Amino acid sequence: MERCVVKVRRVRGGDQNLPCYMTVHAAGMDLCADLVDDLVLNPGERKLVPTGLAIALPDGFEAQIRPRSGLALKHGIALVNSPGTIDPDYRGEIGVILINHGSEPFVVRRGERIAQMVFAPFARAELVEVDELDETARGEGGFGHTGR
């Protein structure tokens, strides 16, 4: 398991909890909503939820913002751009774009865990333009090519 040191800043000061791993083997840290007032997310509606946090990642690492499975299963709450990517040179507040795919309004409260943040190394590619690509068994088989 690769480790990285991530600097974190509370954007508005505040006393909100910093993200943390909820279990010893968790891959993601839970991110919480940093709200003054409750936020109501009606069915079909999407809103940007502030976390009150900004981070500085080491070079070669990204932070992926992912949905929480419990919110998805129990309430139909998902992330519009999943995963969201925080680049190592971004220094602004982390926001989470939530959408309500459920049938009931969902209330987001201050301090509620709304997403997970997973840190991952990444590679920067060098693109080489060619006239043809190597053949593979799959070829150009796309969506659903192996069955249903």
Curated annotation (Swiss-Prot):
Co-factor(s): Mg(2+)
A biological-process GO annotation: dUTP catabolic process
Residues reported to bind substrate: 68-70, 81, 85-87
One MF annotation (Gene Ontology) recorded for this entry: dUTP diphosphatase activity
Enzyme Commission number: 3.6.1.23
Superkingdom assignment: Bacteria
Record family assignment: Belongs to the dUTPase family.
Functional description taken from the UniProt entry: This enzyme is involved in nucleotide metabolism: it produces dUMP, the immediate precursor of thymidine nucleotides and it decreases the intracellular concentration of dUTP so that uracil cannot be incorporated into DNA.
Classification via HAMAP family: dUTPase_bact
Record protein name field: Deoxyuridine 5'-triphosphate nucleotidohydrolase
